[in-house]
Amino acid sequence: MLQGHERSITQIKYNREGDLLFSSSKDQKPNVWYSLNGERLGTYDGHQGAVWCLDVDWESRKLITAGGDMTAKLWDVEYGTVIASIPTKSSVRTCNFSFSGNQAAYSTDKTMGQSCELFIIDVRNADSTLSEQTPTLRIPMTESKITSMLWGPLDETIITGHDNGNIAIWDVRKGQKVVDSGTDHTGVINDMQLSKDGTMFVTASKDATAKLFDSETLMCLKTYKTERPVNSAAISPILDHVVLGGGQDAMEVTTTSTKAGKFDSRFFHLIYEEEFARLKGHFGPINSLAFHPDGKSYASGGEDGFVRVQSFDSTYFENIFE
């Protein structure tokens, strides 16, 4: 159990090798941990508000964070210094590096009279002048705001999840929407995570379901049903498993009992859509989940401010569906 945040966790993410685990929370300070023994390596000080989202690039050199203080910040992972701070007109909700690491995308909230917008910036030779440079692409969202985002294959597209349950794919070169999912989800899309090969992604929604989609066509392949809002979902890199986490909305939580089973991590079979395991642990809703890149453990970040890393025992790998 990793204890280093004073307020609820908003997102956790492993780097590509899996030796580092990054966590962001509402307490303004993203942390980086050594995933093997849970040692905290450092914090990234600079935000003046909640940090909603973070992402680390392919080489673990740069970190991007999305802040409620109306800035997106680019950090040096090793030294913890701010490379660039990009001011926005409303709080930044999502951020992601492209696979190449040459570009980063971030989106702003639809608040205070500002519309939601998606920005793409070039981070190859990023320095403090990045805040004055014009983004390589800027797409205003006319309908509903973006609540989660992924880069598509070959850095050619961006997949966005919205607060009305819609999912769309945007062509990065043209700045146009190329695919729209329609109404597969009826609630806010809280999280989207790609499979290891990038051909599929799983969504987590407030409508109490997680769904598996094709990354190119947005065809809904599978649905994993629960009784409560799903805040996060992740796909195992080695087995046909999906883990879901959620619970009630934070403001509706009145009990701290873990016995009720509201705040468990729930494991489903990717193909058969059947739940086969639950793991307890958090005293409150789970806000973010991530599988370790080797698939032998997973991490969860909760409303209780803790990050829990749990390793699977041998029976997990021997579990064969009949």
Curated annotation (Swiss-Prot):
GO terms for molecular function: RNA binding; translation initiation factor activity. SMART domains: WD40. WD repeats lie at residues 4-43, 46-85, 141-180, 184-223, 281-322. It is found in: Cytoplasm. One of its GO terms (cellular component) is eukaryotic 43S preinitiation complex. The keyword Nuclease does not apply. The keyword Cytoplasm applies. Keywords: Cytoplasm, Initiation factor, Protein biosynthesis, Repeat, WD repeat. Pfam families: EIF3I. HAMAP family: eIF3i. Belongs to the eIF-3 subunit I family. Component of the eukaryotic translation initiation factor 3 (eIF-3) complex, which is involved in protein synthesis of a specialized repertoire of mRNAs and, together with other initiation factors, stimulates binding of mRNA and methionyl-tRNAi to the 40S ribosome. The eIF-3 complex specifically targets and initiates translation of a subset of mRNAs involved in cell proliferation. Component of the eukaryotic translation initiation factor 3 (eIF-3) complex. The eIF-3 complex interacts with pix. This is Eukaryotic translation initiation factor 3 subunit I. It comes from Drosophila willistoni (Fruit fly). The gene is eIF3i.
